[in-house]
């Protein structure tokens, strides 16, 4: 998705610029619009539209970032040059725009802190307090071998994440690992652990290779559509941090 970490809240208000440019060829998204038939698609904008209208987009168009209300057809999902994030069909375009504004307003400070951690070469474990500042629910970031890269929790509200480790190791206990692996084989979404704990899974891949998974446990607050959008956004940003200079202390990656 181009709905990634180069977008700031201010970008959606028409102000260009971002704190992290790992690729000089990458430009910021500069606006969020409700799609209307007949308009000329513009690059680097987010278009909000119903799934049934995707077929009406001209065959020749710039690279587009779309929020589809309802699940698109397989043909649309595979169409080149269209990055699509689809959401539940009960949402209206106006609700999506409102969610986007809230999302990026909430995300701005989070992104700046991620940027700082990246530039300081901090390990993934340094993410824990940053994640807690954005997500009320416990969140677990795991690597390709189901090792725990980051663990965020409010100990006053929940101790479940404390019990997710396999003994005193840095790996998930088998029951959590099995549940998370099943969720990561597909596109993620809402699932639950063998203990019956609901969670939201967002797998992050590069060229079909699983890099890591983000798991938000629903133990303090119900999972929301905003959580899903924000986790997708966060996952792609963390992937870009890996590409720049984020150090994974477990796997011994070196600064690039």
Regions found by a protein language model. Give the residues of each.
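Alpha-helical/coil-rich non-catalytic "connector" segments in signaling and regulatory proteins
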Residues: 1-254
